Structure formats: C-alpha cells, structure tokens
Amino acid sequence: MSFDLAARLAARRADNLYRQRPLLESPQGPQVVVDGQPLLAFCNNDYLGLANHPQVIEAWRAGASKWGVGGGASHLVIGHSGPHHELEEALADLTGRPRALLFTTGYMANLGAVTALVGQGDTVLEDRLNHASLLDAGLLSGARFNRYLHNDADSLAKRLEKATGNTLVVTDGVFSMDGDLADLPALARETKAKGAWLMVDDAHGFGPLGANGGGIVEHFGLSQEDVPVLVGTLGKAFGTAGAFVAGSEELIESLIQFARPYIYTTSQPPALACATLKSLELLRSEHWRREHLQTLIRQFRHGAEQIGLELMDSFTPIQPILIGDAGRAVRLSQMLRERGLMVTAIRPPTVPAGSARLRVTLTAAHSEAQVQLLLEGLADCFAQLKSEPSHA
C-alpha cells in the first residue's frame, strides 16, 4: 500500500484549509514586501518592534565578529559560550528566579520541560486551547494525559482529584489564537492545593505584560512557588530567536540532565545571544513601547466594535476577529490584501471547526495612522463580505 498524499492534499484544498507560505522579501516590520507586493502587515509577533532595532542589529554584528556565526556543538560538549551564560543570568533576573536555561526554539523548550518532568505513572493536565507544542509534549511524555475546559479552574480541580504520580498542570499564559489570559491565580491555587506543579508557557506575555515586561506572572504578582516552571520565547517581543525555561536551581539542573531536546542539539549562535541581551535591555528600559502598544490596542478595539466586528476577550496585542466559516475568513483576508493590508486567516485545525478568524496582531512599531488604515479597510471589506453569498 502506498501513501496517498495527493488525496490528502486535495481534501485540504476542498475544505479551504490548504496552507501556503508567503514569501517575505523585506525586513520584518509593519511595512513589508510579500510575494512582490508592498503591504501594511498586521500579522507578525515582533510585539515591541525590536527585530530591526539598530542597537540589536549592531549587537549581533559585534557578537558575530567576536564569536563567529555558529554554536559549534551542544551545550554539554563545548557549545555553551559566554554570551549564552550571560543571557541565562539576565533572563533569570528578569523573571526573579535563581536560574534560566536557553533552548533553541519554544517548541523544544516546551517538549524538553514536560518530558523531563513527567513520564509513565505520572499525570499531565492541560488547557484545551494550549499551543500545539504543549499538547505534543504531553502526549509524548508517556504520562497520563488529559485536558481541562478552557481557563476553567473547577474543571482542572476535578481532574486533579483523579491524578496519579507527579502531576504537572500546563497552560499558555496568553492564548495565541484567542489573545485571552490564563486565570493564573485560580489555576495556581488549585494546583498547589493538590501538591501539583504549574507550568506556564508565556510566549506572548513577555514584553507586552507586566510593569517591566516580565509577562503574565509579573502581571498577576505571582511567585515561583505559584508557577514553578516558567517558559518564554525570544522570537516574539524580544525580536530575536530561541526560548528559555526559568525556575529553581533544582529544576534547571534537572533539565540539563534529562531534557533531551536540550541535550541533543547544537546551541544557538552566540551572536544571537548577544543580540538578545541588547533587546532584553531595551525591553526592560523603554517602557514607552508597552504604553504605545496599549494605546494601539484600545484604538483598534474601539474602532472594531463601532464597525460591528466580533472581537474576543483580549487586551493583548493578539486581536482575533471571529468570522466562523473558513472560506469567508480566507475571502476577507484576500479582500484586505487587495487593499494593501495583510491580516492572516486562521482556520481549522489550528482553531476549532466553525471558529475561523482573522488574527490581527499589533506591535509597538505600528502607528495610530496605520491602525486607522486597517480599521477603514476592515469596515469596507466586511460590508462587502456581508453582501456576498455565504458560499463565496
């Protein structure tokens, strides 16, 4: 029997779920060139506008001149360089924890943390809307795996009653497709009451949230005791690439010993760590970036509500517009693109069937005038979409 890949691809096309890669032909930012077309983009996650910051670029350039362009080996062989170590110490300071550990990607950080902490005989409990990397990590861990209702501490409590072995509760901090925040105080309360551990992937919270950009844990004023395992990514608000896990001395040493995605891969380029050190400095010192971003979020939500768009409960840079039908979401995205606006349509299986949406992401690099252009485009295109047959 052969693999019938053509049939699988044809079925995905027929369901309006076929994915294609746009080709970016310019630096990342609000104004981009995609597939040869100049566009105003509202779909990247460079939340604080640091990816093209001159000081970050210069830090990378200087780092490459001093350290070269490759990690050269895994961290446990000879790939753990001075910039890596300095960045780990800076991330530990940002999170207020004793240690932090660098990973090459957010996916690897989540997979490494979960599989190092639980296995056969243990339990993993996850929010139904967690990122795919967290769900994959839970399934691959070998532990008993179950999902609780979205952001529902009571649903979690019922599953905690049936948990066996070491129990790890895992949640996104900011949910990437809805933009809402995990109810960390309630989740931490239920988790601690049962002697379990809470792990938070705050990929979208670091930078935009917290008085100093420390993310959702800082936002809620929680401690390491509340959230023993804290994950962050560096490819979003930090504007670079990579990820980290922050926590106790024992946690980080355990990950060094047992996290296979950490052990068996080459370290990130030291120059990348140099760039991230500079972006971290800017993230913590340039508070105007968070303030400007919040101004844009308020502007967008007010304008979208006036148009009659169905928004979700989010005060983060992620602002989904619920459409429902995947075909209509794709059509609206295409209409906006014809007007020079790039907003991505998100469809199943990334989101549940019947909940296709446009996912607007705002950044500190956007201006109020650019957000107004988006709102005007949405008003015109949404009115046109409503006048078209539902099968369009």
Swiss-Prot record:
Swiss-Prot/TrEMBL catalytic activity: 6-carboxyhexanoyl-[ACP] + L-alanine + H(+) = (8S)-8-amino-7-oxononanoate + holo-[ACP] + CO2
GO function terms (MF aspect): 8-amino-7-oxononanoate synthase activity; pyridoxal phosphate binding
EC numbers, comma separated: 2.3.1.47
Alphabetic keyword roster: Biotin biosynthesis, Pyridoxal phosphate, Transferase
Residues noted as binding substrate in the record, renumbered to the chain: R19, H131, T350
Keyword Transferase in record: yes
Residues holding pyridoxal 5'-phosphate: G106, Y107, S176, H204, T233
Listed pathway(s): Cofactor biosynthesis; biotin biosynthesis
Record's subunit section: Homodimer.
Protein name: 8-amino-7-oxononanoate synthase
Natural source organism: Pseudomonas fluorescens (strain Pf0-1)
Gene this protein is translated from: bioF
